[in-house]
Amino acid sequence: MANVALLSAASPSTSSAAPRLRHVARRRPSRRSACPRSAASRLSIMAALGEDPIRQWILTEGKATKITGVSSIGGGCINSAQCYKTDAGSFFVKTNGRIGPSMFEGEALGLKAMYDTNSIRVPLPYKVGSLPTGGSFIIMEFIEFGCSRGDQSALGRKLAEMHKAAKSDKGYGFYVDNTIGSTPQINTWTADWIEFYSKHRLGFQLELITQRFGDSAIYDKGQRLIENMHPLFEGAVMEPCLLHGDLWSGNISSDTDGEPVILDPACYYGHNEAEFGMSWCAGFGGEFYSSYFEVMPKQPGFEKRRDLYLLYHYLNHYNLFGSGYRSSAMSIIDDYLRMLKA
């Protein structure tokens, strides 16, 4: 992809009307199950073969003359993560031994789009490529995290500033399809938000559930909701804003100055309220919302729509982690069907 190739040139330098849900918020599951090949073994193999594109980039375009250390900094079975320490500073590297560059290309485009808004801090992506042992990598700016998630008020304000700054004249969608967790996320440009959210978010997840679990009951009810949800948007002014797309607590931090940092996006241009879809796993407080709505005013019917945006992520968690999330998703659907008399 030409757009991603350009990155390699960068150098480091609730109201009563709302449905009443019975689901219980829970922590997002860990993905640290056994992986087919560890990042360390892949790196060792590449070093032995003398074919390490990560080191090659760092020692050329990364402007380092030597790498002083490589340390693991977590990750899971989707990706592994390392910090490369050099005489030109540190680099954050993610690798995946099974998936080609397209996943990281989507991440890089999202990071760069958010970075270019000059609003909230995100790591700048430098390079995406293939690994000779199979799989792919992404090199990006290393941000030293502080001791906390930072100030909730600042997070709300800066997130709203990003939404306000980055609008799309192409409609709703993104330049490429990407992933939400490991689930494909379809981002075909669409002029109408309700159509986009119906087809490429709720509808797509419901189809996956049917394919993977044969759950026709949730599919049928979900389709009834999609067909009848238009009244939830009456009076709302909607514009395609750049969204992080997967804003849960694990993707929110702060730098050593206490400024908020967001990472690991699943970006697309969408209705700004959709950004709160992972709020059940993000810990947003009153200060966050107050500061956010000072910049991006709350639209009529916000409370009625809030759980509609939670639904996308509950359906995705059903697809990713199994039927433990089914009751939460079905609860939201049932409550909306009652409210809409559908």
UniProtKB/Swiss-Prot annotation:
Its main location: plastid. ATP binds at E141, F142, I143. InterPro entries: Fructo-/Ketosamine-3-kinase (IPR016477), Kinase-like_dom_sf (IPR011009). Keywords: ATP-binding, Chloroplast, Kinase, Nucleotide-binding, Plastid, Transferase, Transit peptide. It is found in: Plastid, Chloroplast. It holds the Pfam family Fructosamin_kin. PANTHER family: FRUCTOSAMINE 3 KINASE-RELATED PROTEIN, PROTEIN-RIBULOSAMINE 3-KINASE. It comes from Oryza sativa subsp. indica (Rice). Residues 1-46 form a transit peptide. This is Protein-ribulosamine 3-kinase, chloroplastic. One of its GO terms (cellular component) is chloroplast. The keyword ATP-binding applies. The keyword Mitochondrion does not apply. It is an enzyme of class 2 (transferase). Initiates a process leading to the deglycation of proteins. Phosphorylates low-molecular-mass and protein-bound erythrulosamines and ribulosamines, but not fructosamines or psicosamines, on the third carbon of the sugar moiety. Protein-bound erythrulosamine 3-phosphates and ribulosamine 3-phosphates are unstable and decompose under physiological conditions. It catalyses: N(6)-D-ribulosyl-L-lysyl-[protein] + ATP = N(6)-(3-O-phospho-D-ribulosyl)-L-lysyl-[protein] + ADP + H(+); N(6)-(D-erythrulosyl)-L-lysyl-[protein] + ATP = N(6)-(3-O-phospho-D-erythrulosyl)-L-lysyl-[protein] + ADP + H(+). Its EC number is 2.7.1.172. GO terms for molecular function: ATP binding; kinase activity; protein-ribulosamine 3-kinase activity. Belongs to the fructosamine kinase family. The active site is at D246.
